[in-house]
């Protein structure tokens, strides 16, 4: 029986990054993966969706080329090619992970891994054979899948999850998207840009409900302007395939009335369910709560030498969180002096148009925490770079503690803001105050100047407003 220092179940951004760091630390490492290397993120999530969204963005630019003084005639999208490009990008990235496994001398086992006694893993291989490996430490990073609701039973054809939404053979004429988190909003933007009639149904009273209220309002305004119908405080009560092969979606609306929408496709984007069934948790006595594995600050479960990271534990279900958790976990195992992860300094991004990026407290959260706050906001309509780019929607909003100047939160909506949020993450990590941001010279003309200007607005020193 082959033995390893570290065995990792799952090769998503939690699993494969952890494996590489473990190898760098001199630990003999193995990964068990039942599907493609890279997990959901590389194959069915973060990466292929961004490829789809880039195609949508290019198509939008061509549609509005006259605004830039350029005439384009007889253009159209090829939906099959858009999907094919996305799949090719995913395959390329998965091959890249395979290369990294070989480079770092990490052994990859292709099959379904189940925890067994004495820190062993029983692997049901793709060829039907079974073998067993042992590890000194075992890290569970099996990720999650699309969650189903009773009224939204997915059939893979008419009522679908995010996987099917990425690989539809034909572009639907209309689609109802249930849920307005990152997944729902990104697909809403993509399909709307492609020419599909989109309706968003959100149970809570605003879209992207985890974001600052001002962000939700700005995004809703932009989506409606582009023809997307939005039903907030609404709930899907029933779905039924009708005689024409479409779906009748019965919705209880905010007024308390019901309405039925006839649509080709329903996309369920109501969250995720962890992949922790049938992997041996119960047999070993590993504790779970509400679909999550219970862990300490350094990701060890209640059973010694068993760890869990990523979507299977409490916290934000984000790729970069899983990677950070995995690195911290394995460094702790290797004997390094590490500090627990600061979950209040995790950035979140939504890649619609305009993009959304945020970190830290929203304004409401800061007030509820008891802070006296300074708030600054700078609109991209006052940004030279945004005006020159023809993308002047949105703003940057910053929140500071009035007493000590702590940077409590930063919230952005606009073109390219997902590439700007790192300034706030680094600033908050280094305990930067607003005064230090103001003294840091920002290049002109850039979108990132809006961060400095928003901070200036919080301190009543804004120049370009």
Identify the role of each PLM range.
Residues 7-14, 18-35, 47, 51-58, ...:
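Flexible, glycine-rich terminal cap/loop adjacent to redox cofactors
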Residues 2-4, 20-27, 32-171, 199, ...:
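Glycine-rich flavin
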Residues 46, 142-197, 201, 229-230, ...:
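Glycine-rich dinucleotide-binding loop and its adjacent helix/turn
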Residues 7-9, 113, 132-143, 178, ...:
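Short hydrophobic core segments
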Residues 110, 295-298, 363, 401-402:
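Short, acidic, Ser/Thr-enriched surface-loop or helix-capping motifs
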Residues 156-171, 260-335:
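FAD-site-proximal beta/loop scaffold in flavoenzymes
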Residues 1-12, 171-181:
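Beta1/beta-strand and adjacent pyrophosphate-binding region of the FAD-binding site
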Residues 14, 38, 183:
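Hydrophobic/small residue at the entry helix of a nucleotide-binding pocket
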């Amino acid at each position: 029986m082959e033995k390893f220092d570290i065995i990792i179940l799952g090769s998503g951004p939690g699993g494969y990054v952890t494996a590489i760091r473990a190898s760098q630390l001199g630990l003999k490492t193995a990964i068990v993966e039942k599907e493609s290397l890279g997990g959901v993120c590389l194959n069915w999530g973060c990466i292929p969706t961004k490829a789809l969204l880039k195609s949508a963005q290019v198509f939008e630019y061509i549609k509005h080329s006259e605004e830039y003084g350029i005439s384009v005639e007889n253009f159209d999208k090829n939906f099959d090619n858009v999907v094919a490009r996305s799949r090719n990008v995913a395959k390329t990235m998965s091959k890249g992970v395979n290369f990294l496994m070989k480079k770092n001398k990490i052994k990859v086992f292709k099959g379904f891994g189940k925890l067994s006694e004495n820190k062993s893993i029983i692997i049901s291989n793709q060829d039907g054979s079974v073998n067993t490996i042992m590890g000194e430490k075992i890290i569970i990073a099996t990720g999650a899948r699309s969650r189903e609701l009773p009224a939204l039973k997915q059939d893979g054809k008419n009522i679908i999850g995010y996987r099917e939404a990425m690989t539809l053979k034909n572009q639907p004429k209309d689609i109802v998207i249930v849920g307005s988190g990152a997944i729902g909003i990104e697909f809403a933007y993509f399909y709307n840009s492609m020419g599909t009639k989109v309706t968003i149904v959100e149970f809570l009273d605003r879209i992207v409900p985890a974001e600052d209220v001002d962000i939700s309002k700005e995004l809703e305004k932009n989506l409606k302007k582009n023809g997307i119908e939005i039903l907030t405080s609404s709930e899907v009560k029933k779905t039924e395939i009708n005689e024409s092969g479409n779906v009748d979606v019965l919705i209880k609306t905010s007024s308390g009335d019901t309405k039925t929408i006839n649509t080709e496709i329903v996309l369920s984007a109501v969250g995720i369910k962890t992949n922790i069934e049938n992997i041996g948790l119960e047999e070993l006595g590993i504790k779970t709560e509400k679909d999550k594995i219970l862990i300490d600050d350094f990701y060890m479960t209640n059973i010694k030498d068993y760890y869990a990271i990523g979507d299977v534990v409490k916290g934000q279900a984000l790729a970069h969180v899983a990677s950070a958790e995995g690195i911290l976990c394995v460094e702790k195992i290797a004997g390094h002096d590490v500090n627990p992860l600061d979950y209040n300094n995790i950035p979140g991004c939504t890649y619609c148009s305009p993009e959304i990026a945020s970190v830290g407290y929203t304004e409401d959260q800061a007030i509820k925490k008891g802070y006296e706050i300074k708030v600054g906001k700078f609109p991209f309509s006052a940004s030279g770079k945004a005006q020159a780019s023809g993308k002047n929607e949105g703003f940057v909003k910053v929140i500071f503690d009035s007493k000590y100047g702590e940077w409590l939160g930063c919230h952005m909506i606009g073109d390219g803001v997902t590439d700007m949020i790192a300034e706030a993450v680094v600033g908050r990590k280094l305990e930067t105050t607003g005064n230090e941001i103001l003294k840091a010279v920002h290049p002109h003309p850039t979108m990132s100047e809006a961060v400095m200007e928003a901070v200036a607005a919080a301190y009543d020193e804004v120049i370009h407003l």
